[in-house]
Swiss-Prot record:
Name of the protein this chain belongs to: Myosin regulatory light polypeptide 9
Origin species: Bos taurus
Bilayer-spanning residue ranges: none
Keyword GTP-binding in annotation: no
UniProt subunit comment: Myosin is a hexamer of 2 heavy chains and 4 light chains: interacts with myosin heavy chain MYO19. Interacts with LUZP1; the interaction results in inhibition of phosphorylation of MYL9 by DAPK3.
Domain EF-hand: 29-64, 98-133, 134-169
Miscellaneous comment as given in the Swiss-Prot or TrEMBL entry: This chain binds calcium.
GO biological process terms, semicolon-separated: actomyosin structure organization
PROSITE patterns: EF_HAND_1, EF_HAND_2
């Protein structure tokens, strides 16, 4: 009977341990990048991201988040946000994104010459006037790290790769 109890306890603990499986979703360099991001957000260095940490981090980026916005962000986590929870949340978000070919094909609809690029002014117009409209500030933020050549061509193939795999392979 005690062996049955042990199995029952193990089964009950499984959901808590399942978060550690998130480490298998990312390679070592990605985990290191997430750790660096976590440490930048964890302003008070207590090993947890709290509402004040989020506020300070966003303020350092020139944002002035409301309490409601911060509460909504904090409520996305089922409990305290330590590094494992942070990684789990990112894993869930990344798994929730569309497959790479779906994203690339969405951009390709606006690339009539099949060059793999879209003129940045045309893409800005599309993003600010169609569907879930972006603000000019949101487009500016997107373009800040986007692969745009000197002629103003947004490379959506490279952008999609960065979106799904990160910028780490850029030098490879």
């Amino acid at each position: 009977m005690s062996s049955k109890r042990a199995k029952t306890k193990t089964t009950k603990k499984r959901p808590q341990r399942a978060t550690s499986n998130v480490f298998a979703m990312f390679d070592q360099s990605q985990i290191q990048e997430f750790k660096e991001a976590f440490n930048m957000i964890d302003q008070n260095r207590d090993g947890f991201i709290d509402k004040e940490d989020l506020h300070d981090m966003l303020a350092s980026l020139g944002k002035n988040p409301t309490d409601e916005y911060l509460d909504a962000m904090m409520n996305e986590a089922p409990g305290p946000i330590n590094f494992t929870m942070f990684l789990t949340m990112f894993g869930e978000k990344l798994n929730g994104t569309d497959p790479e070919d779906v994203i690339r094909n969405a951009f390709a609809c606006f690339d009539e010459e099949a060059t793999g690029t879209i003129q940045e002014d045309y893409l800005r117009e599309l993003l600010t006037t169609m569907g879930d409209r972006f603000t000019d500030e949101e487009v500016d933020e997107l373009y800040r790290e986007a692969p745009i050549d000197k002629k103003g061509n947004f490379n959506y193939i490279e952008f999609t790769r960065i979106l799904k795999h990160g910028a780490k392979d850029k030098d490879d």
